[in-house]
Amino acid sequence: METNKLYECTVIIDGGLQDEPIAEAMAMVQKVITEKGGSIKSVLDIGRRKTAYPINKKTIGYYAHIEFTADTPVIAEIERVLRYEDVLLRYLIIHLTTPLLEMRKRVEKYSVVIGSPEDKAAAEAEASEEEKK
């Protein structure tokens, strides 16, 4: 019996598009996930960013992360549909395992905006105390 697993889908949409086609592309990705039997947990729109290298001669992409749960066979169906969408420059679906989730919690815990040297020293002291445990 398959149980739903937690996945993360990162998509890069053509950043040269206007806001409306980008919103439609995001809605399409979410619709594909839910139609194929997935359940969306969260959506994080990162926004337009410069890509590390040109993708299909485009250097600006609109980045988004979608966390969802689904059965393992559903992932192949989702990828099959996303593969043929022209507005998506890239997509990647990964299974979020326990070590990845623990690492994410640690990164979120220590990723504070450090404004003053005192804040930086306090964050470093807290990190060293955690490492000693």
Curated annotation (Swiss-Prot):
One GO BP: translation
InterPro entries from the UniProt entry: Ribosomal_bS6 (IPR000529), Ribosomal_bS6_sf (IPR035980), Ribosomal_S6_plastid/chlpt (IPR020814), Transl_elong_EF1B/ribsomal_bS6 (IPR014717)
The keyword Secreted belongs to this UniProt entry's keyword annotation: no
Key words, A-Z: Ribonucleoprotein, Ribosomal protein, RNA-binding, rRNA-binding
Entry's Gene Ontology molecular function annotations: small ribosomal subunit rRNA binding; structural constituent of ribosome
Domain of life: Bacteria
One Gene Ontology cellular component annotation held by this UniProt entry: cytoplasm
Family: Belongs to the bacterial ribosomal protein bS6 family.
Protein function: Binds together with bS18 to 16S ribosomal RNA.
Name of the protein in its database record: Small ribosomal subunit protein bS6
